[in-house]
């Protein structure tokens, strides 16, 4: 159990939730060695499993056009700004940041996304990611605690 909690990358939770929402299975392999991990990867590939990288790109392709359209409504150039926009979008879906206003966690965002943080595209992407997380339930649900505060 302890190994499981340590091994799941939180940055990818939105991809797991998206896959499950579309009826796909999500398989986690906990390998004790590089050789074991390589064998597991080969086995998964031969069974037709999609890699996390492939799933990430497929997910983005599925939402890219509507996001591009929305971004360009104000005369912006999505193709030039896509890298920063996408970083902001994905940052908003992280379990530790979901639903939180940009201003509230700006210092953490600046620390983790120093290359993109100061761009308007990153901020716009973050705002769109927050909205997308709410609309699609890709952000982890918030739970009401007994004290009345909300917690992820």
Predicted regions located by residue number:
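Intrinsically disordered, low-complexity, hydrophilic segments
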Residues: 1-152
